[in-house]
Amino acid sequence: AVTVKRMGVGEQILLADGEGLVAHAVVAETTKGELTAHVSEVTRETPPAVTFTLVQALAKGDRDLQAVEAATELGVDAVVPWQAERSIVQWRGERAEKARRKWVAQAEAATKQSRRATPPRISDLVTKNAAAQAISATVAEGGLALVLHEDAEASLAQVELPSAGDVMLVVGPEGGITPVELDAFVAAGATPVRRGATVLRSSSAGPAALAALLGLEDDLEVVAVAFEGLVRLDAQFDVQVAGRS
């Protein structure tokens, strides 16, 4: 960090332990690869009354990773990788744990980038039934479960958030959520909602909905930072695909 950020004496920095503790400090001395800082204040982040969980379907071209990155920068509290029926990517055997660690690393990097005190929790991979059980548990505890779906009658803008509890947001893969999956989630207590008139990619649908729920749509700087990487990586992916065709 000293080399990459070119930190100098007198600069103010934030140090976090990843569990909500934040130290405000001033750089006192720097050497190659190391620095000494004087801590001026230590605070502990208060857990929010309302938390947000993104159930993200596995997607090709690292679009799911892009969603994890942007959602983390926007403030998501937990991310659940979901093996949807139409997911092209498959997590099996040793690949499952390796892929999950990649999600964890992406979330940790985005946490540092956005100067969050706590990274989001990345759960183990779930299938339809496990996702439905998680939805049922969330609703039973007074939370809210929403499924992004282009044919939904309710609009995301009409959603009223609970005063406390978890808000679970389910995002499908490139091919969309199957009728069987949607029926299972609705039976578990989820509400299908549409974000708007346009259909977004799996990489951006979750973060866009999250920004709306968090009331960040008017904060152009926050949203622009979170989506800058999505636009860049999506463009690179499209170029690569075009080159292979």
Show which residues each predicted segment covers.
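N-terminal positively charged helical leader segments and presequences
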Residues: 1-45, 94
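Gly/Ser/Thr-rich beta-alpha loop segments that engage phosphate groups in nucleotides
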Residues: 12, 63, 174-178, 198
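Short, ordered loop/turn segments at secondary-structure junctions
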Residues: 18, 42, 83-87, 174, ...
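Active-site/ligand-binding-proximal alpha/beta "capping" segment
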Residues: 142-182, 190-194
